[in-house]
Amino acid sequence: MKEEIPLDKLIDLIINDYDRERIETGIKRQIMVQENKEPDYLPLFLHGKIPEMDRFPSYDRRDQFYDPEKMLYTLLWGCLSIIRGKADNIPCVRVNFGTGFLATVFGLEQQIFPDKMPWLKSHLEIEKIMKMQIEDLEPLEDKGLIPQWKRYTDFYREKLKDIPFIKMYLPDTQGVFDLAHLVAGD
């Protein structure tokens, strides 16, 4: 029997505490700062502990890595904390496969831990990298963790369709130099 994950109960808590005006004000303040304009005050980013969490299950990072429902559920606790904090944060979630996410496109695998973020098991030799062709990475949507990312993203979209104030953002793709370091090592 599949374990019941109380995702819908958590979504109900979020919807009940949502303050549209509060979120819109936070977004406006952040936009003003990004556009080098002066807001009424600098955005404040606050959140705190959620008392209800003690009555709900929790899932470690390994559980989340292999289950989109557990990952989204865990991330939504942060969104509830932001909403209750009534600061200028924007509640948001992402598929969180760790910094090695894009490196898996090159055929690298990550070690998955219960208590910390995933980490690459190995690197590619420079000689192999130098011989790679674009065709080696195609079709990109079938490589590495990209199919899982798409599946998790589709799941998130479906579950969040009635709460558009929770934004989705990109997984940790790293910059080009960090990605090169992850793939090639030192």
Where do the language-model regions lie?
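Catalytic cores of TIM-barrel enzymes
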Residues: M1-D186
